[in-house]
Amino acid sequence: MSYSNAYAPSAPELPESFVQQQHDGESRYTYAYPSYQPTQQFSSYSGMFSPETHPEIVRSFESADRNRSGFLEESELRQALSLSGYDGISNRTIRLLLFIYKIPVDSLLRLGPKEYVELWNCLAQWRAIFNRYDRDRSGKMNSTQLRDAFYNLGCVLPTSVHQLIVSQFDDGTGKTVDLCFDSFLECGMIVKGLTEKFRENDPGYTGYATLSYDVFMLMVIPFIATYD
């Protein structure tokens, strides 16, 4: 039985530079972890993962699962991602990821091995998109770069919507708004997820859909009300 969460947006398509690495024989994980050299590992957790799972995924999961429950809760997921090179992920984004990738039949916000693998692989693809549009390698993405990234994700936003999104990350200092990877991941997951949910009700891609109030609320609320 599949337990894929209905709210998880599809992973973004990889940049051509990333795909070329695969064609050249490089591991897809080297894009996110260029310094990591896989070695044979023997772990009590290995049996929880499929044989082809990258050892780094198993290692980070095992190291973060402090209570040995076989699941990662909020603080444990933050540690696992930090061990995997994703430092600085905010509480909001951690909770968003937990909600999106958790087992739907589980009432708790936590990830098992299968869900963690799905998240881990998806994050590498989001990181690849971020790196592609962070052209000056500043670790930040400006408004124009964000617009281009959304376009690449298949989300052509009206200017008013784009400006509203950018304004959510304005710190009030009057400086130009730049988004770090964490902020890009948060807004990207929400925009892409909501776009895909809308398109389920707009199969002709007309840009219009007829929704009942209940359907609208069920579509939007899970993306915006779970994380503070």
Swiss-Prot record:
Top-level taxon in the UniProt lineage: Eukaryota
Entry keywords, A to Z: Calcium, Metal-binding, Repeat
UniProt: Ca(2+) binding residues: D65, N67, S69, E76
Family matches, as Gene3D superfamilies: EF-hand (1.10.238.10)
Single GO term (MF): calcium ion binding
One of the Pfam families matching this protein, by short name: EF-hand_6
InterPro entries: CML48/49/50 (IPR044590), EF-hand-dom_pair (IPR011992), EF_Hand_1_Ca_BS (IPR018247), EF_hand_dom (IPR002048)
Matching SUPFAM superfamilies: EF-hand
Domain EF-hand: residue ranges: 52-87, 121-156
PANTHER family per UniProt: CALCIUM-BINDING PROTEIN CML48-RELATED
Function text: Potential calcium sensor.
Name assigned to this protein: Probable calcium-binding protein CML48
Originating organism: Arabidopsis thaliana
High-level lineage: Eukaryota, Viridiplantae, Streptophyta, Embryophyta, Tracheophyta
Gene field: CML48
